[in-house]
């Protein structure tokens, strides 16, 4: 089992301009994510959710404290962590199969082997016939599936997901939430996902971490079992309609409202 850990990790943006003040974005974050866990981070704007993901990815380094993978300090991006953004960031001049195979090409895998592996991954994400299609021929949901397949190509220990479904319509988003859970289970990786949606957090998470804003601090770390219900075969619509789901949704809404200024929350 691998573990991604934040130990007293703080992030400070330096002052800008003569009269600017340094900004404390994240304050003494203590958090761990293990393989086999799906941890979802929620919080208001200004709580540092994306900054937290950037630290995990190695795009930024903490100003204080440390972020480590299996005890080794993270000093930059690595193939043991794969990032999926809201924007699919695919290469439009390549077809879907070659997009998925691109990380394998960088690793030096031969063409025949990487194309075979890309085909396996496209089948995993439900797109076995899409390999020769150009990216601009695919719907938004299909592009995100290709992006997730590409992220899995290097067999990362952790998937880092920055609102990967946020730009999709409600129906496609709901369908891909169940798909994402299934892919995570089959990949046997750990997952750290950022979202504004309490509903999405409850459906996907094995643990929900709530960040308070300005600066971002861990306000709560709560286990959740609804994802296990869905993976066991319960329809997401029935899970959403359950009294337990509604109680936890209301509780999280109240918590987030209590720790930040009034503003609209995503359902």
Swiss-Prot record:
Membrane topology field: Peripheral membrane protein
Database matches in Pfam families: ABC_tran
One Gene Ontology cellular component annotation held by this UniProt entry: plasma membrane
CDD domains listed in its UniProt record: ABC_NrtD_SsuB_transporters
Primary location group: membrane
One GO MF term attached to the UniProt entry: ATP hydrolysis activity
Occurrences of domain ABC transporter (ranges): 6-238
EC number(s) per entry: 7.6.2.7
Localization per Swiss-Prot or TrEMBL: Cell inner membrane
Entry annotated with the keyword Nucleus: no
Catalytic activity: taurine(out) + ATP + H2O = taurine(in) + ADP + phosphate + H(+)
Annotated binding of ATP, by residue: 43-50
Keywords: ATP-binding, Cell inner membrane, Cell membrane, Membrane, Nucleotide-binding, Plasmid, Translocase, Transport
SMART domains assigned to the protein according to its UniProt record, in alphabetical order: AAA (SM00382)
Keyword hit for Transport: yes
Assembly: The complex is composed of two ATP-binding proteins (TauB), two transmembrane proteins (TauC) and a solute-binding protein (TauA).
PANTHER family: TAURINE IMPORT ATP-BINDING PROTEIN TAUB, TAURINE IMPORT ATP-BINDING PROTEIN-RELATED
Membership in a protein family: Belongs to the ABC transporter superfamily. Taurine importer (TC 3.A.1.17.1) family.
Known role: Part of the ABC transporter complex TauABC involved in taurine import. Responsible for energy coupling to the transport system.
Name of the molecule in the record: Taurine import ATP-binding protein TauB
Gene: tauB
């Amino acid at each position: 089992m691998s573990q991604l850990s934040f130990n007293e990790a703080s992030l400070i943006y330096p002052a800008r301009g003569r009269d600017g003040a340094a900004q404390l974005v994240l304050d003494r974050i203590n958090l761990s994510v293990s393989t086999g866990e799906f941890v979802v981070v929620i919080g208001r704007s200004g709580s540092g959710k994306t900054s937290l993901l950037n630290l995990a990815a190695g795009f930024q380094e903490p100003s204080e404290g440390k972020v480590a993978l299996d005890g080794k300090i993270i000093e930059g991006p690595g193939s043991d962590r794969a990032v999926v953004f809201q924007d699919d960031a695919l290469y439009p001049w390549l077809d879907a199969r070659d997009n998925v195979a691109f990380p394998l090409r960088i690793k030096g895998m031969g063409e025949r082997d990487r194309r075979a592996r890309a085909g396996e991954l496209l089948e995993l994400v439900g797109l076995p016939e899409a390999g020769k299609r150009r990216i601009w021929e695919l719907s938004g949901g299909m592009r995100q599936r290709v992006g997730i397949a590409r992220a899995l190509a290097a067999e990362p220990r952790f998937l880092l997901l920055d609102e990967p479904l946020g730009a999709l319509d409600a129906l496609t988003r709901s369908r891909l939430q169940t798909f994402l859970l299934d892919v995570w289970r089959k990949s046997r990786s750990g997952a750290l996902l950022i979202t504004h949606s309490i509903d999405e957090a409850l459906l996907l998470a094995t643990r929900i971490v709530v960040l308070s804003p300005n600066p971002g601090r861990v306000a709560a770390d709560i286990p959740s079992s609804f994802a296990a219900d869905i993976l066991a075969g319960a329809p997401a619509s029935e899970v959403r309609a359950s009294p337990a789901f509604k109680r936890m949704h209301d509780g999280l809404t109240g918590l987030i409202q209590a720790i930040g200024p009034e503003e609209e929350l995503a359902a």
